[in-house]
Amino acid sequence: VALKNLREEGFHATGFDRNDYIGGLWQYSEKEQTSVMETTTVNISKERACFTDFPFPEDVPSHPAAAQVQQYLVDYSKHFKLEPYMRLGTSIKQITFDDERQKWVLNIEGGDKEYYDKVVVAIGGMVGKASLPAIEGIEKFAGSNVHSQAFKRPKDYQNKRVMVVGFSNSAADTATQLVGVADKVYMAHRHGARVVR
């Protein structure tokens, strides 16, 4: 969206993405990286989740599945003819300012340097390494301890007792996916909450 808006305003903008596909975390991945779960659906309506100048197609349900959101983003880039200005599969390792040239320097993985007048950094969601909280005594726990970033398949937890720590969207999605698969699902969180069935 930033790329599209900048180009509409007359900037000669280029978009970079380290992924080799459009859609970021909305594309499900088996890799231990941040992505949606296979069964993720949007928790707001498509009318609120869409960009103002590009509604979701009529045949998409009110709360689209992750794959439908990912396709929506692909369709968005095609509709606004953004692909020629996108460099997918390109990692920016560092951004510095060259005082002599008065340009921003992008150090691209592989050793290339490119110079730009302006830089907009637009990253969404958690894109780095998972950060597990320090839990006293966790080293004594004999079971597995994984971050939601690594949770991909509910069937891996079949007939197990699972504790989901937290009450964020990811925690709620994880717990929901485990119901009916795991033997027991518990949620631990700091604040009171009501769960409505």
Regions found by a protein language model. Give the residues of each.
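Glycine-rich dinucleotide-binding loop and its adjacent helix/turn
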Residues: 50, 56-60, 65-72, 78, ...
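Core beta-strand elements of the Rossmann-like FAD/NAD(P) dinucleotide-binding domain
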Residues: 108-118, 158
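N-terminal Rossmann-like FAD-binding beta1-loop-alpha1 element of flavoenzymes
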Residues: 1-15, 171-178
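Glycine-rich active-site loop/strand segments that organize a redox cofactor
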Residues: 11, 18-75, 190-197
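Short glycine-/acidic-enriched loop or helix-start segments at secondary-structure transitions
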Residues: 2, 25, 130-132, 174-175, ...
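A conserved short coil-to-beta-strand element within the FAD-binding core of flavoproteins
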Residues: 88-103
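Generic structural signal for residues in well-ordered beta-strands
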Residues: 13, 86-88
